[in-house]
Amino acid sequence: MSAFGIRQLDHVNLRTVNLDAMTEFYTEVIGLRSGPRPAFPFPGAWLYCGDTPVLHLVGVEQALHPREPQIEHFAFSATGLDDFTRRLQRHGLDYRRSKVPGTSLTQVHLRDCDGNHLHVDFEGQS
C-alpha cells in the first residue's frame, strides 16, 4: 500500500447555460478538443488536452447567481505564446498579458463566454 499524495489537478467542471458557445470557445480559442463522455442523463461535453479530459462542461437551463464567485480562476500551461495571442485577436477577444515577478512565466488572462476568468501560462516566453 502506498502513501497518499496528490499528483495533479484532474479536471475542472463548469455549469453553463451556453453549452454550445462554451464548447466552441474552449475548442476553437483555447485549443482543447471534444472527446468521449459517459452517457450521463444531462447535457454536457468533455474537452481534452491530449488523452486527458481536463474540462467537463455541464449544460443547465438556468444560471446560478452566487453572491460572489467561488472560483477566481483556473489556468492552463501552454507553448506558442505569439500564436495564442494571434488566435485571441482573430476571435476578437480581450486579454491581458502579465509577467510573474521573479520568474520567466508569462500569463495571458481572459474570460470565457460565461465570464469565467482563466489564464494560459507560457514558461520562458515573453
Regions found by a protein language model. Give the residues of each.
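N-terminal beta-strand motif that seeds the catalytic metal site of vicinal oxygen chelate
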Residues: 1-20, 51, 71-74, 126
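Vicinal oxygen chelate
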Residues: 1-5, 85, 90-126
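Exposed loop/turn and edge beta-strand positions of beta-sandwich/beta-sheet ligand-binding modules
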Residues: 8, 41, 70, 104
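Core segments of cupin and vicinal oxygen chelate
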Residues: 13-54
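Helix N-cap motif at beta-to-alpha junctions
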Residues: 18-19, 79-81
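A short, compositionally biased micro-patch
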Residues: 40, 50, 81, 101-103, ...
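Short, charged/polar surface micro-motifs in flexible loops or helix N-caps
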Residues: 51-55, 61-64, 81-83
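Residue-level structural signal for beta-strand termini and adjacent loop
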Residues: 59-60, 123
